[in-house]
Each structure stands twice: as C-alpha cells, then as structure tokens.
C-alpha cells in the first residue's frame, strides 16, 4: 500500500501531461455509493485507480488488456465533419485508459480527462506517465464544466451515465453541448 501511494505522490509533478486536483474537494454524493462493489465508491479510497484498473481486467476477461476496450472507444468517437480536432474532453475518465487512447488516436490534439475522484485522476496521471502519453487530468464534475463555450472539438463519455442520477445526466449532456464548438461531436459509449 505504502509503495503504491508513494508512486502516486512522486508522479504528481512529473510529465508528460499534467494533473490538477484539490485535496479539499468534496465529491458529489452520487459518487460515494458502492458502485461496482467498491465500498464507498471511487472517491474515498486513495488506491481506487489501481483497484478499478486491475478489477476491470478481471471483469472483462482479458478484453481490457492493452486497453482494447478504450482503444476501440477512441476509434469509435465521432470526429467533426471538417476533420479539425485540436481539443478533446473525456468526461468521467476514471483510470484514464480512454483518455490516453484518444491521444494516441489524435496525436496532434490536446486531450483532457476529467473526473470527480482525485484517487482515479492520480492513478490515471501515473498510468499516462508510464505510457509516455501527454494528456491532462482535471478534477471537476461533468455537470459543471470549467471551460468556455465552444472550447472543444470532441467530447466523449465512456461508461459514465450509468454512474449518475438521471437529473445529473441531463446536466452533463447540456454541459457537453455547451463546451462543444459548432460542428463538434459528442460521443456517448
């Protein structure tokens, strides 16, 4: 446990990519439920990212190896008709597999993953560093994005909506469209 926590701490100031979160942030109550058999959700346990990532590999029966699911999600994400992809947002990025896959699919784009769980973001950042992929991770709720209108070319939500109450899900959709530029794409998988 201490070794893993030390690795997360050491990665915080390293790159490529960046990590921003607030140690005093209180995640929304909906994130604290025992989802996927994780007691207290993925916000309360500092090693939640490790638990999620390795648990997913077991649950998916090997399909999560080499980020197979995330790579296919990145390939399936809609690209604007004009082909211009400069900024991509991954909503509810969890362990960051889809975030890094999006960067590999669109190497010239700035890719940002957001999540309410600092533990997940810290792991996602460590994972991206280990893979040498420059992506950015920010702590914020998908229903209240801290970006200007029209900022992104693409927004993706991979396996996010089953984690949210319906009222929050509607706000997430509104926010996704708000931060998309005209002609941008919003993909829900």
Residue ranges and their predicted role:
Residues 143-155:
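A short acidic, Gly/Pro-enriched loop at the edge of an enzyme's catalytic core
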Residues 154-167:
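A short SAM/SAH-binding and catalytic strip from SAM-dependent methyltransferases
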